[in-house]
């Protein structure tokens, strides 16, 4: 006789086992129609699974975050249903939920084409319109093995092999199609409406290149057609802003097969890089960082001492010299510890803040490489703070100020903050963890910031704070981090003399603001669609004449602009001025200066912006004031 407690505290008594479907019906027909699943004593459950004991329950609908995930997972099974009807020889592998949608990995003899996707999408819509119930059966691994053996689903059998014999498996039945999943799933296809199949790509079974290459069909699904349309619009806008396309169009960088994951920076792109680096260098100097430079290639022995060799060697590029094995550094931290270790340190010397624009190499899988966002060679705006336990909070507070100062300069005002705390397997005493976690949370609270807690998500060697940016398309990019480390200083024999004259290992704070220069530049390019803030633009001004006889005045103006410290060029081509304006506007040049006979006569210039605004005629001195103000204030253009 289960007693069911609802979210408002009210109770319902039942004579025998009861389902979420029944409870929702008893509450009201509207809720019964909207119910997707239930949260029972904290666990999600299908609407048809019996509840036999007392329970606290919440009815899940599409309005809940869990509801959207259930819809997406159910769409993955519906995709499988459609594929098996159209291509009976296909073998189904896995179909999980991902950000904004779902995918299904499929083995099939022919390559799926855009025409195939259209056919599959059409069949999915037909299945939805049949408005059928999705049935659930709870079985043993042995029974599941029998079911999928009869169907020849080899990938399902491979999954079942690794499931303990005493566990249960849920089989979800879409008419004649059977799939397995933890669930829950929607009770009826009427809940599945707003979706679109997006693309097909390749993926190895279990991510192992020694296994079969499968075809991965991606889809997106939403609560309603309005949200779907908004998402499709965002995707289309993101494609227009793709930093790889703009990088080529604006001649910023390129990649080629001879150096996968390594960037060929063009002069324009390298200018952005250097300006960004100079800005970070200037900003962190106000926070008393000391910049250093550490070796690019370091002997295996140091990586063994630091613990990276055991955990990271597969991702390292290695080489040998004089019978010794070396690694190109994948991170900078062990090298920074070596700098700290030079000479005796007192508690009076702490904190010591070291920084480096450290070039790192990681042997990322070729399939994971993605423009500037995922590369094999990148430069971190890396920093390490050596301090005492008592100094952690103050150092974190200072870093928070630094992070927000930098992000504000680039127009990022929506910052998501997460605090990750101790995992089950960790080093250090509970007392040390208590103090360090409190130091981080107190630092965040002292700044009046909203933040979320991720229990158990910290590294084994200390808690951390992550800072993520939200761009103009509401995409979230994790960039900044500050990580407490109790382990590495001890592993690498770091110490300072405390107030009692005893040796103590310092606390090490790993911190980065941008993450990597390459990825951050990619984020900026996409956020601004190439229309970078004036101070960051590789070329800020182009001067052009209306006729050839104005060329000397243009060249003279360009020379003065360069002397003022601006990045300027001159266009003396024998082309119509309208053509030049259009071309340089397409190149995202912030200011275009036009000089004709009247401008020469009056010692003036005409100025246009890349947004098409005519600023009219003015003296060069007045234009210099506009430029100086824009650059000094780090003026931003609207992200459009």
UniProtKB/Swiss-Prot annotation:
One of its GO terms (cellular component) is cytosol. Keywords: Aminoacyl-tRNA synthetase, ATP-binding, Cytoplasm, Ligase, Metal-binding, Nucleotide-binding, Protein biosynthesis, RNA-binding, tRNA-binding, Zinc. Binds 1 zinc ion per subunit. Its main location: cytoplasm. It is found in: Cytoplasm. The keyword RNA-binding applies. Residues 1-61 form the TGS domain. The keyword tRNA-binding applies. It catalyses: tRNA(Thr) + L-threonine + ATP = L-threonyl-tRNA(Thr) + AMP + diphosphate + H(+). Its cofactor is Zn(2+). It is an enzyme of class 6 (ligase). Its EC number is 6.1.1.3. Homodimer. Catalyzes the attachment of threonine to tRNA(Thr) in a two-step reaction: L-threonine is first activated by ATP to form Thr-AMP and then transferred to the acceptor end of tRNA(Thr). Also edits incorrectly charged L-seryl-tRNA(Thr). PANTHER family: THREONINE--TRNA LIGASE, CHLOROPLASTIC_MITOCHONDRIAL 2 (PTHR11451:SF44), THREONINE-TRNA LIGASE (PTHR11451). HAMAP family: Thr_tRNA_synth. Belongs to the class-II aminoacyl-tRNA synthetase family. This is Threonine--tRNA ligase.
């Amino acid at each position: 006789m289960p007693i069911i407690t609802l979210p408002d505290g009210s109770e319902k008594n039942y004579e025998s086992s009861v389902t979420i479907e029944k409870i929702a019906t008893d509450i009201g027909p509207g809720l019964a129609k909207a119910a997707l699943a239930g949260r029972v004593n904290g666990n999600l459950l299908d609407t048809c699974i019996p509840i036999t004991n007392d329970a606290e329950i919440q009815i899940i609908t599409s309005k809940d975050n869990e509801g959207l995930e259930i819809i997406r997972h159910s769409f993955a099974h519906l995709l499988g249903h459609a594929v098996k009807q159209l291509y009976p020889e296909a073998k189904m592998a896995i179909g999980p939920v991902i950000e904004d949608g779902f995918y299904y990995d499929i083995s099939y003899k022919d390559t799926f084409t855009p025409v195939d996707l259209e056919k599959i999408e059409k069949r999915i819509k037909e299945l939805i319109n049949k408005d059928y119930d999705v049935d659930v059966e709870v079985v043993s691994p042995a029974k599941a093995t029998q079911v999928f053996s009869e169907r020849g689903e080899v990938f399902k059998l491979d999954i079942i092999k690794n499931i303990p014999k005493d566990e249960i498996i849920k089989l979800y039945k879409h008419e004649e199609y059977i799939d397995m999943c933890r669930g829950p799933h929607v009770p009826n296809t009427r809940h599945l409406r707003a979706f679109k199949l997006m693309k097909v790509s390749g993926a190895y079974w279990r991510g192992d290149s020694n296994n079969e290459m499968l075809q991965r069909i991606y889809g997106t699904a939403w609560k309603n057609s309005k949200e779907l349309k908004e998402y499709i619009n965002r995707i289309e806008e993101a494609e227009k802003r793709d930093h790889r396309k703009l990088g080529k169009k604006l001649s910023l960088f390129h990649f080629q097969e001879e150096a996968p994951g390594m960037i060929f920076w063009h002069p324009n792109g390298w200018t952005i890089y250097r300006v960004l680096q100079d800005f970070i260098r200037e900003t962190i100097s106000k926070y008393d960082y000391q910049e250093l430079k550490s070796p690019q290639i370091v002997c295996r022995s140091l990586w063994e001492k630091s613990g990276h060799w055991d955990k990271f060697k597969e991702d390292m590029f290695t080489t040998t010299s004089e019978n010794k094995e070396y690694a190109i550094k994948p991170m900078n931290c062990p090298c920074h510890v070596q700098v700290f270790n030079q000479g005796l340190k007192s508690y009076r010397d702490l904190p010591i803040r070291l920084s480096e624009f450290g070039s790192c190499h990681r042997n990322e899988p070729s399939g994971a490489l993605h423009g500037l966002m995922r590369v094999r060679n990148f430069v971190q705006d890396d920093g390490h703070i050596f301090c005492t336990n008592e100094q952690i909070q103050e150092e974190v507070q200072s870093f928070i100020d630094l992070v927000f100062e930098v992000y504000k300069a680039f127009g990022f005002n929506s910052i998501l903050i997460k605090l990750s705390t101790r995992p089950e397997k960790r080093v250090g005493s509970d007392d040390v963890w208590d103090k360090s976690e409190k130091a981080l949370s107190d630092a965040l609270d002292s700044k009046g910031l909203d933040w979320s807690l991720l229990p158990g998500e910290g590294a084994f060697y200390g808690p951390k704070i992550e800072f993520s940016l939200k761009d103009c398309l509401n995409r979230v990019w994790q960039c900044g981090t500050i990580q407490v480390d109790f382990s590495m200083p001890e592993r690498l024999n770091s110490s300072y003399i405390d107030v009692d004259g005893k040796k103590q290992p310092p606390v090490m704070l790993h911190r980065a603001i941008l993450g990597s220069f390459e990825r951050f530049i990619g984020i900026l390019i996409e956020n601004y669609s190439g229309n970078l803030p004036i101070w960051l633009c590789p070329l800020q001004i182009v001067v052009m004449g209306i006729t050839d006889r104005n060329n000397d005045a243009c060249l003279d103006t360009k020379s003065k602009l360069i002397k003022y410290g601006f990045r300027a060029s001159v266009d003396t081509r024998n082309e119509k001025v309208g053509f030049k304006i259009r071309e340089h506007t397409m190149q995202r040049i912030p200011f275009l200066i036009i000089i004709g006979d009247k401008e020469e006569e009056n010692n003036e210039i005409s100025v246009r912006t890349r947004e098409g605004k005519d600023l009219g005629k003015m003296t060069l001195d007045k234009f210099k004031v506009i430029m100086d103000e824009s650059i000094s204030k780090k003026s931003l253009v609207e992200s459009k």
